[in-house]
């Protein structure tokens, strides 16, 4: 039984490491000095003159931190899957929400029902930094500004919900 446990630990570690290996690792610093660790993958075989969609993936609360690795725990391997990469070539950004922060809202809403969500809140510094990161990639000529996808799970889904309410977050500045 002990051997199986050890095998499972090594197997889960190897899956986690393989999810990290295909991603570029970087830290974005905003114009106000706020930093946001993120991972990114590019389309495997980019063709000159072709534009590719951009996918922004927002992770859940359990992956917050500053190690620039935990945000790949759920979903990281899916974007690296060779079949998916060939069939759906895209730029994929996977930022990491800092520990103690919440995607998009200035503070976590007390109710998670859409009708009770706070409306008209000012963007948090994290959201502004995320917007600047997004704008950096939207300025690239290879990115199709008409195909921007924001997806998330759990806390990231709430960030997605909030992000699309800020039209200026999902629309390029230029």
What annotation goes with each model-predicted range?
Residues 129-145:
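Conserved acidic catalytic loop of the alpha/beta-hydrolase fold
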Residues 147-149:
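Residue in the alpha/beta-hydrolase core beta-strand immediately N-terminal to the catalytic nucleophile
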Residues 167-173:
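Conserved small/polar residues in nucleotide/adenosyl-binding loops
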């Amino acid at each position: 039984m002990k051997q199986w446990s050890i095998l499972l630990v090594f197997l889960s570690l190897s899956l986690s490491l393989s999810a990290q290996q295909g991603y570029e690792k970087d830290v974005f610093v905003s114009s106000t000095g706020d930093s946001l660790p993120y991972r990114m993958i590019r389309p495997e075989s980019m063709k000159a003159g072709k534009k590719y969609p951009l996918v922004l993936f927002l992770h859940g609360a359990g992956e917050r931190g500053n190690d620039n690795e935990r945000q790949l725990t759920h979903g990281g391997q899916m974007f690296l899957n060779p079949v998916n990469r060939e069939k759906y070539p895209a730029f994929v950004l996977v930022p990491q929400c800092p520990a103690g922060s919440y995607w998009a809202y200035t503070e976590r809403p007390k109710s998670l029902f859409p009708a009770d969500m706070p409306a008209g809140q000012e963007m948090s510094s994290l959201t502004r930094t995320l917007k600047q990161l997004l704008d950096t990639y939207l300025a690239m000529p290879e990115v199709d500004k008409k195909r921007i996808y924001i997806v998330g799970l759990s806390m990231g889904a709430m960030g997605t919900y909030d992000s699309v309410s800020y039209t200026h977050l999902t629309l390029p500045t230029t």
